[in-house]
Amino acid sequence: MWSDPIADMLTRIRNANAAFKESVDLPASNMKRAILEILKKEGYIEDYKYIEDGKQGILKVFLKYKGDRRNRQRVISGIVRVSKPGRRIYVSKDELPKVKSGMGIAVISTSKGIITDKEARKKNVGGEVICYVW
């Protein structure tokens, strides 16, 4: 059993992305599904699919790359877990981070749900910084 399933998910995505895999399988949870929905909406992944397996289910994530088969480039340059079980990182609405000077996104868990840093600025809320993606 893992102590941090979100870090495990991000690591699996990072490793599959580095190896130019088409897809990666993850154990499912509602929080992971919400994070994947943000990554899909922001254009970092192609899509994801929930597969029922009689237990908790599996999320199959389809990764996205730029260019043709010979000259592939990764869409996700970096993905980093920020708030961890041993050290939670919370920010107020005034301290919301800009990732890579606005070129990346921060995924924030707020009272309004799991949203990006840009949406949190619009909704004027702070929360727990889950991860950075660029």
Curated annotation (Swiss-Prot):
GO terms of biological process kind: translation
Origin superkingdom: Bacteria
Keywords: Ribonucleoprotein, Ribosomal protein, RNA-binding, rRNA-binding
MF annotations from Gene Ontology: rRNA binding; structural constituent of ribosome
Cited InterPro entries: Ribosomal_uS8, Ribosomal_uS8_CS, Ribosomal_uS8_sf
Cellular-component GO terms for this entry: ribonucleoprotein complex; ribosome
Subunit structure: Part of the 30S ribosomal subunit. Contacts proteins S5 and S12.
Family: Belongs to the universal ribosomal protein uS8 family.
Function of the protein: One of the primary rRNA binding proteins, it binds directly to 16S rRNA central domain where it helps coordinate assembly of the platform of the 30S subunit.
Protein name: Small ribosomal subunit protein uS8
Organism lineage: Bacteria, Thermotogati, Thermotogota, Thermotogae, Kosmotogales
Gene coding for it: rpsH
